[in-house]
């Protein structure tokens, strides 16, 4: 990703990150000499940490793949959408998505312990690195969560998970 950003800068081209293409707002539409950068191949899940309850995910990891991965280990990733089979972790973070369980579990921001981001100048930033208590100053990771790719391209995230709920009940309010 960094090399593509540097190349695009050299040729005065814009870069539009593209994830699962589940957004309906048109934010990932490229125009005016723009390069579309697919993040599909950044789909690795690694460094499962049962003590800190975190796992490292590439931006292209499908939401449902992460849910299944932690569920196999008897844990739970609660950020959930109807588009779970195609939405990607990077896009979920870039939009600070909430999903169908947002009232109970919060938005994506609550589940991001660390970020790796490539800025528009090609600089790679490692933000927070999963520290649970970090009182060293500004936590710039929160600037990128919900910024929709305007400040940089999310390439990797340290995602939190939790224990499986004892039971679930669905309630329809109309």
PLM region descriptions:
Residues 1-42, 57, 77-79:
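Glycine-rich N-terminal segment of FAD-binding domains in flavoprotein oxidoreductases
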Residues 44-174:
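FAD-binding subdomain of flavoenzyme oxidoreductases
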